Design a protein with these regions (language model features):
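Short beta-strand-to-loop elements that line the ligand-binding cleft
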Residues: 59-68
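Secondary-structure junction motif
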Residues: 32-55, 121-124
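Extended ligand-binding regions for polar small-molecule ligands
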Residues: 110, 114-136
Length: 136
């Protein structure tokens, strides 16, 4: 397993709520959110809602439900709202979007690699070796 990734706030660059301060969940009580559908991953959905409630974001104002992070980032870049995304999305973030840490958003995202041990593929073995070498 690689070290867990964290969630970040994706916001349009220059968004009023994000200027010059340490961000907390409660700062986004009135912000429009772009959110993923609960049916896509009920456990993840319920857990992130629980973390939000604990941080004072008791009822996120969800203005759009989507199914993937690419769509989330596109809608954030169109200034439709803000969203929580994996920190790894910085590799393909649109220019108009900034990723910001939220100090009380404690929600690690573990990454696991699963493969069949009896698969003799040399390509698979090299891939697994690369992933293992990348672990910190």
């Amino acid at each position: 397993m690689n070290p867990p990734r964290t969630l970040m706030l994706a916001a349009p660059k220059g968004h009023a709520t994000t200027r010059g301060k340490r961000l907390r969940l409660r700062d986004f009580r009135d912000a429009p959110f772009i959110w993923f559908h609960r049916w896509a991953n009920p456990v993840y959905y319920d857990r992130i809602m629980q973390v939000c409630v604990q941080g004072g974001l008791t009822s996120p104002r969800i203005v759009q439900h989507v199914v993937d992070q690419a769509t989330i980032l596109s809608l954030v870049s169109c200034r439709l709202g803000v969203a929580f995304v994996s920190e790894t999305t910085h590799w393909h973030c649109p220019r108009g979007v900034t990723l910001l840490p939220v100090v009380d958003l404690d929600f690690p995202l573990p990454f696991y690699l699963i493969w069949r041990k009896d698969d003799p593929s040399a390509l698979l073995q090299r891939f697994v070796a690369q992933v293992e070498a990348a672990q910190c």
